[in-house]
């Protein structure tokens, strides 16, 4: 059995927990320790429930509070050599990251807490952006947020997953008719920004397989999406792909508040 919880998912901040009931990891550090402590305590948990932090990329909504994490709770921070180099220069992390720095190898697998971890690169306009495949005997979870477009490698690794957390950031009609300037719209939708609902739905058709038990849609835009639009697009894709066979559970993750604590079983 795996346990999954989103503490915040969107441009306001990103932080997720994945564990097995005995140990776990955080993915990203975009919320304050005060909020994290509160949300953990509401589930009867504390900082001892995770032994490491994984970082997906160096945008501020994913690392805003990583410096205080390093200073105050001193958990090892795992990410790629490219991202650790960027964090060593970033004004929010440079004074604290050295004591917690652990490099993931350029190729192959790493043991991080209870998980065997594989990272993979995804297109996004950060220094580098990665997704993670986390494997234990209790199941395999793939996390990919802030994805400009879906790559063949990401699809292949997601097809091995029992549980999938993936971006469904914006509705194209809302984006194009909304208040954003042209340059920002293009940054979002031209392949190195974010994944639209339709792109997420198309990816799910390629990814879904009989062993996929749950899909969580993350990083929904506040201004250019709604949970219903994201859910409906991906639900229809799963209906079409599964053709009456059993479908994975589908959920959208809230932007600024924690999700429920999900128990994940293969």
Give the ranges of each region predicted by the language model.
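Short, basic/aromatic-enriched C-terminal tail that caps enzymatic domains
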Residues: 248-266
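Metal-dependent catalytic neighborhoods of phosphoester/phosphodiester hydrolases
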Residues: 64-73, 88-91, 225-232
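Cap/insert and terminal regions of metallo-dependent hydrolase folds
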Residues: 152-252
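Metallo-beta-lactamase
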Residues: 81-131, 135-138
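Active-site neighborhood of phospho(di)ester-bond hydrolases with catalytic His/Asp-centered motifs
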Residues: 27-30, 50-58, 78-81, 142-145, ...
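Active-site metal-binding motif and surrounding structural segment of the metallo-beta-lactamase
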Residues: 34-79
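Active-site environment of divalent metal-dependent phosphoester hydrolases
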Residues: 12, 59-63, 85-86, 126-127, ...
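Conserved beta-strand hairpin/beta-sheet module of binuclear metal-dependent hydrolase folds
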Residues: 1-43, 130-146, 163
